């Protein structure tokens, strides 16, 4: 009988050891899973902190730039203001001519209609000249003074928007702010993007958020 009892005790010890091994394995798996979850949460927090730091840096840079612009307004005297004023004067005169023609009488003959149409077309051409000159002179000034066009770059990563790189496409949020697709993806959680500027939510549709084609084509 003694050998049987000894064998039974050994079997019980073996079962107890195996049970402890299984418990230890489950505990190790649980610890590993918790470590992975903790690592994921830490990475998410680090990404959020990085984005917040980038936003703070962006706002600081914009504040410094606005102060610089206020202090350097005198530089605009180098722009050929006379050329702009001359074109604007032509535009005003064209508008006055049309207003005067409308006061005198409605066009009753093909010739009068043609004259009025030509006056209107000339006014449109003058307006476009003013617009083109304004834009060209502004670009010259910005280039000369080494001022960046902030709206051409993502406000978070400061990368310039790209037509070819999909990650740098400008994406429009519901609140109207633009960010690159890469930063949008980092900010997206549970299908919702929270704007870092006004904290408004934008739900990501199945087809994705719309691109700002106007910024891409500039």
Swiss-Prot record:
Cross-referenced Gene3D superfamilies: Zinc/RING finger domain, C3HC4 (zinc finger) (3.30.40.10)
Zinc finger (RING-type): 154-199
Keyword Thylakoid found: no
Molecular-function annotations in GO: zinc ion binding
SUPFAM superfamilies: RING/U-box
Keywords of the record: Metal-binding, Zinc, Zinc-finger
Keyword Metal-binding appears in the UniProt entry: yes
InterPro entries reported in the protein's UniProt record: E3_ubiquitin-ligase_RING (IPR052667), Znf-RING_euk (IPR027370), Znf_RING (IPR001841), Znf_RING/FYVE/PHD (IPR013083), Znf_RING_CS (IPR017907)
Domain of life: Eukaryota
Protein name: Uncharacterized RING finger protein B0416.4
């Amino acid at each position: 009988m003694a050998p049987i009892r000894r064998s039974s005790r050994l079997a019980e010890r073996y079962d107890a050891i195996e049970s402890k091994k299984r418990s230890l394995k489950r505990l190790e798996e649980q610890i590993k899973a918790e470590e992975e979850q903790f690592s994921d949460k830490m990475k998410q927090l680090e990404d959020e902190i990085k984005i917040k730091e980038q936003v703070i840096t962006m706002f600081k840079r914009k504040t410094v730039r606005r102060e610089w612009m206020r202090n350097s307004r005198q530089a605009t005297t180098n722009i050929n203001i006379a050329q702009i004023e001359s074109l604007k004067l032509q535009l005003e005169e064209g508008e006055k001519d049309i207003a005067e023609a409308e006061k005198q009488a409605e066009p009753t003959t093909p010739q009068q209609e043609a004259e009025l149409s030509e006056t209107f077309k000339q006014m449109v051409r003058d307006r476009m000249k003013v617009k083109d000159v304004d834009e060209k002179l502004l670009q010259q000034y910005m280039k000369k003074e080494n001022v960046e066009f902030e709206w051409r770059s993502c406000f978070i990563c400061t990368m310039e928007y790209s037509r070819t790189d999909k990650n740098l496409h400008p994406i429009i949020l519901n609140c109207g702010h633009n960010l690159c697709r890469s930063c949008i993806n980092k900010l997206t959680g549970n299908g919702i993007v929270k704007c870092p500027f006004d904290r408004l939510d934008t739900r990501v549709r199945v087809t994705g958020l719309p691109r700002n084609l106007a910024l891409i084509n500039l």
